[in-house]
């Protein structure tokens, strides 16, 4: 099974809102996620996250702390998205009862904006969401695990 390791930014503002982005490409187009991307060889998760957010949003961030590492087996899209999960303190393993297309390991960090204006270069939409609004968008499965922890 293909394994992908990524980083994701849970960007918050002074009002406690969280920045969510809508994917503009790929198999999971239109799903909502925390912005971020794949780590390159030799990068720390924090370095990768700063690079990805600059590339995707033209924004410099401060990486504050690791919130959670999620491991998720994404099923073949034709089979749907049924899954079960088990949790411990900082790791969540979500395993599908279906054939997995790939295994995702996503390191999610709480971040704030240092400078920049959040220009959407790869996403089709974005929203600032209060905690009460977190369920108002259709989160991708791995991101949904993190959303539950943030509530």
Locations of the language-model features?
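Intrinsically disordered, low-complexity, charged terminal extensions of DNA damage-control enzymes
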Residues: 58-60, 64-67, 103, 123, ...
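Residue-level preference for beta-strand/loop junctions
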Residues: 3, 28, 103-105
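NUDIX/MutT-family hydrolases
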Residues: 110, 118-150
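Conserved N-terminal beta-strand and adjoining loop/helix that marks the start
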Residues: 1-18, 38
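Conserved Nudix-box catalytic region and its N-terminal flanking loop in Nudix hydrolases
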Residues: 17-55, 59
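Hydrophobic packing within well-folded, soluble alpha/beta domains
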Residues: 11, 45-53, 66, 126
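Active-site-adjacent beta-strand/loop module that shapes the phosphate/pyrophosphate-binding cleft
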Residues: 13, 60, 71-80, 84, ...
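Intrinsically disordered, low-complexity segments enriched in serine/threonine/proline/glycine
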Residues: 85-90
